[in-house]
Regions:
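Generic secondary-structure signature for well-ordered alpha-helical cores
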Residues: 82, 95, 99-103, 135-136, ...
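Intrinsically disordered, low-complexity, charge-rich segments with an acidic bias
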Residues: 2-4, 19-33, 53
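Gly/Ser/Thr-enriched, mixed-charge loops and adjacent short helices
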Residues: 58-67, 80, 88, 177-241
Length: 241
């Protein structure tokens, strides 16, 4: 119901969406059984008065609180693996990146890392967050591997919005070592101070992040896959470079 005044049973989720019609700014709420999520990614309800309303059923908006230590430098954000493994830590920073960009809807992003510990887990999280934030396509390195120069090449060659690189450079890896994440802009180069400051500013006030509830992508298989409405291309890590 539009007023959101519904009685919620334990197996019911509430979904909210804005009408797509330019003439209508109403927000709509709908209750959908969890069992329906397994069958559909989206459904539309035709309404002659207000147009078509699309509900993305498996996008979660997770409440969070800021961390005080997420100020990136030109080499991105580098911390101990155990810091990144804290609940919401990586997600907060990734959402801060997305919120700082000039529109993610319909954009393409490059993604990969140097293969250190936590690389694969982080990539799966970022893929699902990218899908939830409206990216249309992600080019991710085979097995999650993509060096900084190779990522820069992918960004320029395919004119992506930018790229996320998971690397802590010469810092040691392994569970007791370090992990890192940085954003490169559309020219393939590191994010300038204006961008990193915007990311940091957002990280200090963030209160929620979006993530798709979905199975992991098979990073070991080259090819094209769907993750919600987003296309994931698992590409050869060095061919274009």
């Amino acid at each position: 119901r539009e007023d959101g005044n519904v009685k919620i049973a334990p197996d019911i989720l509430i979904f909210q969406a804005k009408c797509h019609s330019a003439k209508c700014n109403h927000e709509y709420r709908s209750k959908i059984p969890n069992s329906a999520i397994a069958l559909f990614e989206k459904f539309t309800v035709a309404n002659a008065r207000s147009g078509t309303i699309t509900y993305s059923m498996n996008i979660l908006e997770v409440s969070t609180t800021p961390f005080t230590d997420q100020k990136p430098g030109t080499s991105g954000l580098r911390k101990a693996v155990k810091v990144f493994q804290q609940p919401h830590y990586l997600e907060n920073f990734v959402q801060s990146i997305f919120d700082s960009l000039e529109g993610c809807q319909g954009q393409t992003l490059a993604l990969g890392g140097d293969g250190r510990y936590y690389n694969r887990k982080a990539i799966q999280i970022i893929l699902k967050m990218a899908a939830a934030n409206g990216f249309s396509r992600i080019k991710v390195g085979h097995r999650g591997i993509l060096s900084t120069p190779a990522t820069s090449c992918i960004i320029r060659q395919y004119k992506t919005l930018g790229g996320i690189i998971l690397s802590a450079s010469h810092n040691p890896g392994r569970p007791e070592g370090d992990f890192g994440i940085k954003y490169n802009i559309s020219n393939g180069g590191p994010a300038p101070e204006k961008v990193t400051e915007a990311i940091y500013a957002r990280s200090k006030v963030i209160d929620a992040y979006k993530i798709l509830e979905a199975s992991d992508v098979d990073l070991d298989k080259l090819g094209t896959f769907k993750l919600g409405a987003m296309t994931v291309e698992v590409i050869d890590s060095v061919a274009d470079y």
